[in-house]
């Protein structure tokens, strides 16, 4: 494989070469045959690892152009390249998954688990969606629809009909995909894709009920007070000034965090500018395998909330950066979304002692608004999650989808009033990006939020221990299950007993004290 790109220092100078997908498949097929013909663990292991190296380098090249596409750079060219990726990937992943199943069924499985951990075979189940020609075709169609959605969003489209048609077709294709793979519904497939092997629909339904019981009433009461919860302006007038403050914060947190930010800034692994064709209101962290580096994307316009969003994404990046230097396999550099979001959301709270650098004298207002926003989001995300479960479980017309959303919204977020005419015209279905891009992901922000609150409470009593537990958690990456990772970080199970109530109560009390 070609050498490292990082010798070129800045990301903007990194070379992109479209993967030769035919050659990638030929090499993986050769590896598959070597695995089948292996007469020793070493031979089998080497061929198995070579499959992973091919995928890792392919995805690395793909990620370079995908980042440029999201940033609106060389837009037409990068768009065409990403569309080619979407067409080619399913057949490559079908071969990858075949090799994974060979490894899972082989006599060398125990030795692989001893060397790399049992979690590597838990992830094999997630990739069932490439097992037959129908599913590969449907995956390609799904990717094309998501690309169509991104184009509409990049243009700032408010074309309700166009957005709805993408939404409607995605529901149909995903249900067909689940059926082609033998799942009872897309809900089951969606849970597998999101690595939710540790908890299922029963746990998430109980979680939603508890949020509705303990969080919704408090938020509704505070909403009635008519307080302006708009975020204060940030001190940083531009992205460069914001990055300087984040660098100072990370350097003070720890040597490891400072080293991470030094490399991020030296290689300019971020883009916070606004420009034509860049995704609107997008804050995200992309992962560059092979180089083991993240890339942060944002649209910074000087708002304090945007400063927090940016720190959130740098938290994702720090977790990936740390795990990639500790865990031997790329798929172990990230965990399930319910854990990954603990990494990033907790970094938002580690930001609190440094708020003087970000919002100056508005520190109290920032904390108040942050706590309020997160509590309100707990309720809103539960509403989205219940909507997702029902929209894939029932065949509903456009108006019926709107009526369903209104009913759910009234129960979780009664402060959000939806005009009657929007219901009648079928215009009030939720426009949440996660529904289109990553079904069943959104609730995992909430599940992570409970652990984040627990970290926050620990920070206030013992900040050193909180940071040590945080570093332990991110270093493990995805090498262990959800519950095992919580235990390693000394965090409670958010689904058991009175955990949710016990953790949320002091957060609500603090918010009331700041009103």
Task: Give the residues covered by each predicted segment.
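Post-HExxH zinc-binding segment in Zn-dependent metallohydrolases
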Residues: 212-214, 323-324, 334-362, 371, ...
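Short pre-active-site segment immediately N-terminal to the catalytic Zn-binding motif
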Residues: 291-311
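Long, K/E/R/D-enriched contiguous segments that form extended
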Residues: 227-245, 366, 371, 375-377, ...
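C-terminal, non-catalytic "cap/extension" segments appended to globular domains
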Residues: 70, 123-125, 310, 318, ...
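Auxiliary, metal-adjacent structural segments of Zn-dependent hydrolase domains
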Residues: 226-290, 303-304
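Short beta-alpha connecting loops at secondary-structure transitions
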Residues: 80, 295-299, 327-337, 366-372, ...
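Catalytic Zn2+-binding segment of zinc metalloproteases
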Residues: 309, 315-329, 350
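A well-structured
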Residues: 1-236
């Amino acid at each position: 494989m070609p050498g490292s790109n990082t010798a070129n220092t800045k990301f903007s100078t990194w070379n992109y070469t479209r993967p030769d997908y035919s050659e990638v498949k030929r090499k993986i097929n050769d590896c598959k045959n070597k695995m089948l013909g292996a007469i020793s663990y070493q031979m089998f292991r080497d061929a198995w690892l070579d499959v992973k190296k091919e995928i890792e380098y392919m995805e690395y090249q793909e990620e370079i152009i995908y980042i440029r596409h999201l940033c609106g750079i060389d837009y037409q060219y990068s768009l065409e390249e990403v569309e080619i990726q979407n067409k080619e990937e399913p057949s490559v992943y079908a071969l990858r998954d075949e090799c994974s199943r060979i490894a899972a069924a082989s006599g060398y499985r125990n030795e692989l688990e001893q060397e790399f951990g049992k979690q590597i075979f838990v992830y094999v189940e997630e990739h069932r969606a490439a097992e037959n020609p129908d599913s590969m075709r449907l995956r390609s169609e799904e990717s094309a629809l998501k690309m169509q959605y991104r184009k509409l969003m990049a243009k700032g489209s408010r074309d309700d009909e166009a957005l709805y048609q993408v939404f409607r077709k995605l529901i149909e294709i995903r249900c067909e995909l689940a059926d082609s793979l033998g799942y009872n519904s897309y809900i089951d497939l969606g849970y597998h894709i999101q690595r939710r092997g540790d908890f299922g629909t029963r746990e998430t339904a109980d979680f939603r009920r508890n949020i509705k019981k303990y969080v919704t009433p408090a938020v509704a009461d505070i909403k009635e007070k008519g307080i302006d919860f708009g975020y204060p302006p940030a001190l940083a007038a531009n992205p460069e000034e914001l990055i300087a403050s984040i660098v100072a914060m990370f350097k003070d947190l720890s040597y490891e965090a400072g080293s991470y930010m030094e490399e991020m800034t030296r290689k300019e692994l971020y883009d916070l500018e606004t420009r034509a064709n860049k995704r609107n209101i997008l804050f995200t962290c992309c992962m560059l395998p092979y180089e083991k580096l993240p890339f942060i994307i944002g649209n910074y316009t000087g708002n304090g909330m945007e400063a927090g969003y940016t720190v959130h994404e740098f938290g994702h990046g720090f977790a990936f950066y740390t795990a990639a230097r500790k865990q031997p396999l790329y798929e172990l550099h990230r965990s399930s979304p319910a854990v990954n979001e603990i990494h990033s959301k907790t970094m938002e709270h580690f930001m609190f002692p440094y708020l003087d650098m970000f919002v100056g004298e508005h520190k109290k207002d920032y904390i108040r608004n942050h706590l309020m926003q997160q509590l309100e989001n707990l309720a809103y995300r539960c509403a989205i999650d219940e909507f997702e479960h029902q929209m894939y479980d029932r065949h509903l017309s456009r108006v019926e989808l709107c009526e369903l959303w209104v009913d759910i919204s009234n129960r979780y977020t009664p402060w959000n009033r939806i005009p009657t005419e929007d219901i009648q015209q079928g215009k009030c279905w939720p426009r949440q990006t996660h529904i289109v891009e990553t079904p069943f992901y959104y609730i995992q922000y909430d599940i992570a939020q409970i652990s984040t609150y627990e970290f926050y409470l620990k920070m206030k009593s013992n900040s050193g221990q909180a940071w040590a537990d945080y570093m332990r958690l991110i270093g493990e990456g995805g090498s262990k299950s959800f519950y095992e990772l919580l235990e390693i970080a000394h965090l409670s199970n958010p689904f058991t007993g009175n955990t949710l109530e016990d953790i949320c109560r002091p957060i609500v009390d603090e918010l009331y004290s700041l009103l």
